[in-house]
Amino acid sequence: MHPPAESDPVRANERLSWAREALADPALDLVRASTDAGFRSYWRTLDHEPSRIVMDSPPDKEDVHPWLRIRALLEAGGVRVPHVLAQDIEHGFLLLEDLGADTFLQVIGDANADDLLDAAVTQLLKLQAIAPPADLPAYDEALLARELRLFDEWFLGRHLGMALDCGDLETLDLVYRRLVDAALAQPQVLVHRDFMPRNLMPVAGGAAVLDFQDAVRGPIAYDPLSLFKDAFLSWPQARVDGWLDRYHARALDAGLPVPSLPRFRRDADWIGVQRHLKVIGIFARLHHRDGKPKYLADVPRFFAYLDGVLPRYPELAPLAALIDGKVKPAIARITEAARG
């Protein structure tokens, strides 16, 4: 199953008709505002004041109920999320306030990063203070392991064409087990799962949070690590360390169950390895299954993150050896082959 093409005339007609009715504006037109890695898309009103956003979630592909549920949960906890002005759940249309055209990813830079990320942490601390509902999915052993397997299935197997021998599989099993155990041992809180600059909007008074529908109960270090070691831009390690320390101090002040700073730093490193491997696999899947090759350009960023962490932990040395000995040579081969 592939995401819809850029132009689906039937769906476009339904979307426009609904927006015109919701806003009582028969002359209204829409222009694409953004899309995501799935099937959801966002459309901005043209020549309508104030500007609004239509979120289009085709019901057979993107159930809008989780988005609405988590939005309400976050709003009740004081997190700044988009306001819903109208909705048609049956057809998957929501009318939202327009928070602007730029996310943190578009506006962040060396000069303003400290202030922007501090605003992001303000929202994150509110999010993590919310008690996860009893029926919220957990970042449990099965989910953590399933995500890790995306790396060997989609990146090593499908993208690189690597045939893993018994020793390779044992290495991955061993390291994956250690990563999963470490994640489960962390204090568990509400986790956004993609708390990063492209899912944060600059608004008056701070930041607004987007793309929260996949929230789970999971490791406390997951979201701050995702924020400071982003999928689409990198920062010097010294700066990342400073932000992690600042988050830790603020989390302590907020009464969140963070461990000691050295333990938190280790937890962030280890859950980062899990996330980096997962995202490498997802980016390969987006290319090969969903026809979205642009994400592959950011894969080297994640190997750089791994290079910075794996050598510090002897328990993760088998993974470092596999990456250096087999994965990087395979990447070099396909890169050379692609150049012709």
Give the ranges of each region predicted by the language model.
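ATP-binding pocket architecture of kinase catalytic cores
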Residues: 34, 40-144, 149-150, 156-161, ...
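An alpha-helical support segment within catalytic cores of ATP-dependent transferases
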Residues: 10, 14-15, 21, 132-138, ...
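Conserved NTP-binding catalytic cores of kinases and kinase-like/nucleotidyltransferase enzymes
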Residues: 1-93, 189, 203-208, 323-340
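ATP/Mg2+ or Mg2+-diphosphate-binding catalytic cores
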Residues: 3, 281-340
